[in-house]
């Protein structure tokens, strides 16, 4: 369970990011609720920790997150500041993965699939259509950057979760077990004998 938070923890620990050791220790001690762990670290309610966690993992902007939290802009800013101060590895991982996407034009999932960032946009803030490199150069000149890199963590985490789920489905199939349905990070199967489920 909690596939995406575990992947965030995995990637943050690979990079040795500050603060992730507390989550790893909790996991190793049998505490498997990432949102509660983060709630305790940041001293904020679990529901707010979960909303912020998932919002950041899925590339939500501050305004959308504020609306999801149902708080004023000032309260949202305080929550974000507290969260990032007490749970620094999430923002550090987001920034690291965004830089990788900007520099390399891709991120690789757990099993090596490439998530590409092939479109470009002007460096300045505004509403612009993302374009292929040559078209962006022709329209905006050399002041361009890769578009949508703010979604890099989402692509890494969701893509890696998909890798894991698909691999599990293949392994089940090899064992003669056919999943009936896949919902998020869950595979539902039927067994004839309860011992098969173990």
Label each PLM-derived region with a short phrase.
Residues 1-198:
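Conserved catalytic core of nucleotide polymerization and phosphodiester-bond processing enzymes
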């Amino acid at each position: 369970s909690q596939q995406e938070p575990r992947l965030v923890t995995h990637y943050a620990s690979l990079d040795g990011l500050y603060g992730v050791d507390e989550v790893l220790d909790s996991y190793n001690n049998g505490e498997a609720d990432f949102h509660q762990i983060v709630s305790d670290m940041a001293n904020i309610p679990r529901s707010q920790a979960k909303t912020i966690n998932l919002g950041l993992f899925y590339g939500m902007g501050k305004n959308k997150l504020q609306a999801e939290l149902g708080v004023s802009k000032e309260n949202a800013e305080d929550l974000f500041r507290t969260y990032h101060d007490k749970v620094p590895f999430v923002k550090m991982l987001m920034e690291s993965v965004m830089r990788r996407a900007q520099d390399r034009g891709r991120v690789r999932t757990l099993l090596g699939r490439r998530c590409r960032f092939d479109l470009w946009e002007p460096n300045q803030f505004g509403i612009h259509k993302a374009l292929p490199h040559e078209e962006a150069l022709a329209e905006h000149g050399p002041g361009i950057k890769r578009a949508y890199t703010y979604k890099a963590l989402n692509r890494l985490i969701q893509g890696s979760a998909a890798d894991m789920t698909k691999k599990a489905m293949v392994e089940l199939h090899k064992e003669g077990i056919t999943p009936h349905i896949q919902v998020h990070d869950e595979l539902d199967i039927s067994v004839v004998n309860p011992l098969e489920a173990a």
